[in-house]
Amino acid sequence: DGSSVYESSLKSLIDEYLRTHENVDANRVYIGGCSNGGYMTVKLVMDYPEMFAASFPICEAYKTNLISDEEVVKLASVPTWFVHCVNDPVVDINTTAIDLYERMKEAGAENLHFSLYDSIVDPDYGNTYNGHFAWVYSLKNLCTTDYDGSNVTVDGNQVNLYQWLATNSK
């Protein structure tokens, strides 16, 4: 139904951390997560867009039919980089990430990226993983391409997901 019993607790945790850690730059708060963590990433950005400098939902599970056009506009205001795999057996990419990406684009998102993979293969050992494990590529700093297959660049330089995150601030 688009709600979460965890949202207020997670928001309170972030608020408390920022309040008690003065050395944290509140203009550079990033949020990301995998699967249900990706759901919570979308949920928190949708409800508190002013809090986050950028987001990176990975194999996010938020059904887009539960997201209003007004909420999409809020999401589009925050730089976002989606990561997902076409053969994800857990989350239907067509009713979550792809649809949300397209709706955010239509809503005018200017700093929007999407690394989409056909399968998840460990680059070091060649093992093939469940398609839901898209975080393998993000954790190995391998998310560098956009939805159309082009390289993501900042100021003419190719960047990975984490380098891109560091370029964003409120």
Name each model feature, range by range.
Residues 74-80:
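Short, proline-enriched alpha-helix->beta-strand connector loops that line the catalytic pocket
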Residues 32, 58-59, 83, 117:
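Alpha/beta-hydrolase-fold catalytic nucleophile elbow
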Residues 83, 89, 105-170:
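C-terminal catalytic histidine-bearing segment of alpha/beta-hydrolase fold enzymes
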Residues 38-49:
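Short glycine-enriched nucleophile-adjacent loop
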Residues 92-104:
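Short alpha-helix in the alpha/beta-hydrolase fold that links the catalytic acid
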Residues 2-35, 51:
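Gly/Ser-rich "nucleophile elbow"/oxyanion-hole loop immediately N-terminal to the catalytic nucleophile
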Residues 2-7, 61-67, 89-91:
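Acidic-and-aromatic substrate-binding clefts and catalytic sites of carbohydrate-active enzymes
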Residues 50-63:
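A conserved short beta-strand
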